[in-house]
Amino acid sequence: VSGGQGSEAAAGAAGQGAAGDKISSVLFLCGMNAIRSPMAEALARTMLPATVYIASAGVRQGRRDPFVDAVLAERGLTLGERQPQRYEDLEDGYFDLIVTMAPEAHHVALDAAGTSSVEVEFWPMPDPSVVTGSREQILDAYRDVLKRIETRISGRFGR
């Protein structure tokens, strides 16, 4: 299990795990599966091959965030009818790679990974829901996080 910011270098070629094996499933995990991890899931579905299974979850139950829908719609993306889900409620709990976006999610993923061969990477992302101001200022914070996630996915998977 890898768990630091240096884990990207250890991952080797884009789309491969540390051992060089192809990654076939990715879970994006954050606090409530309301903002960062659903954004990552929506982006990854367009940036990674269709053969890669992509999911997202939170360590706690969250509510769908309308600002996420707004910034995704600006990019022509949608979550459809998808609602936030908890990590412990996932039907298939095995993933080749778990990308965590909040410290609490990282600790949960490391504990869950235990001695298994799953890779865990921490991609710290700011929480745009703490930003105050006008609607446009708040949307800018969400856009910034979306762009950061897109950059990380592109860098990690070479897309």
Q: Whereabouts are the PLM-identified features?
A:
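Conserved active-site segments centered on acidic
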Residues: 4, 12-88
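Mid-chain, well-packed structural core segment of small domains
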Residues: 93-112
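Structural signal for conserved beta-strand scaffold positions within catalytic alpha/beta enzyme cores
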Residues: 56, 81, 100, 121-124
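Structured loop/turn residues at beta-strand edges in well-structured enzyme cores
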Residues: 21, 93, 118
